[in-house]
């Protein structure tokens, strides 16, 4: 990942967009910062009986379209500027797709691999204890994001109901079906990215059945994108992921992968590093692959100026939020490489 500040990135994009649309400068002033950002300290009793304090955030960018809406991520790199930027992207996504929501985003600075299941539950409930006055189905509606899932949403909703007496299940989305969740929610983003990829290739005169695709990130979005692209006939030849012990790694198979088998292996082992019959390549080689599409589905700022100059793909589809930074975007435009933006691709 590049060190380019994500808030600075989205502000540059907003500034340029306002200039292109010839909007009054006050529009940019309204959008460049969230309406509020809440920073909290969450005390959690660990399994050893000692307390540990975790830093958390919730950014509420703009509610002109409706209640704030956006995920909560658990990751060691979470910070205030990141959640501010992500909440701005959520405002743009909801507006672009005509959804009656504004933009929100939250997160906790934590490595979930270091916590037991009980500690993770106490942390999730603690986040709600500190923030419950600022959320609700008509005000701010959290959802899953990086390293959070339907189980964590269920814990959070349960805690919210205990604290408020308000049993409206719509306060949190992304829950299990038995707890007020929606059919297809888990796969929805990946399906959308896959459809956008197929249709974009079609515009370029490329049949998806003859395409080669590389995906960065194999979490919920990346794995479901791969699964549905394979069903459409796409050939996934490379996947880049992160392993706590190995760091960033990339697997490659010029003949393509069996995605169902990859998903099963990843769910069982939480890594693809040791997957059978693959070639390991560097992340630099990943960006330089002779493929038709690169789909970044990891974290923001994955593609900077250096990566943009190496890319040989004809198309980049932003499965993650803000994976191509402002400067890289200009380079790709000059090189006639099409970027399908996150506010459309993963909305």
Regions found by a protein language model. Give the residues of each.
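Short, Gly/Pro- and small/polar-rich lid/capping loops
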Residues: 2-41
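Glycine-rich, N-terminal phosphate-binding loop and its surrounding beta-alpha-beta segment
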Residues: 40-48, 53-112
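General beta-strand structural signal in soluble alpha/beta enzymes
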Residues: 85, 139-143, 167-172, 238-241, ...
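Glycine/serine-rich phosphate-binding loop and adjoining beta1-alpha1 elements at the start
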Residues: 95-209
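Short, surface-exposed connector motifs at secondary-structure boundaries
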Residues: 135-137, 206-210, 289-291, 308-315, ...
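Glycine-rich phosphate/diphosphate-binding loop of Rossmann-like nucleotide-binding domains
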Residues: 176, 181-288
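Rossmann-fold NAD(P)-binding glycine/threonine-rich loop
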Residues: 298-347
